[in-house]
Amino acid sequence: MVCIHTENQNQGDFYPFVLLEISVLHESPLGHLRYRLTDVPPQPNSPGEIYCFYINCIMNRR
């Protein structure tokens, strides 16, 4: 299992401090990663897609 911790401080009102911990559970034979997010504070003013953005950025760094 691989854990990746990232922090982002955005100056905008809609994206306060976000701490993400991504745990890579395993990689399937097709190359798709399965993961889970932990330690993500509620973001009532943020669109849900923001988490997908961070996941894609982090996973593409491999």
UniProtKB/Swiss-Prot annotation:
<dbReference type="InterPro" id="IPR052997">
    <property type="entry name" value="RRT15-like"/>
</dbReference>
<keyword id="KW-0804">Transcription</keyword>
<protein>
    <recommendedName>
        <fullName>Regulator of rDNA transcription protein 15</fullName>
    </recommendedName>
</protein>
<comment type="function">
    <text>Involved in modulation of rDNA transcription.</text>
</comment>
<keyword id="KW-0805">Transcription regulation</keyword>
<comment type="similarity">
    <text>Belongs to the ART2/RRT15 family.</text>
</comment>
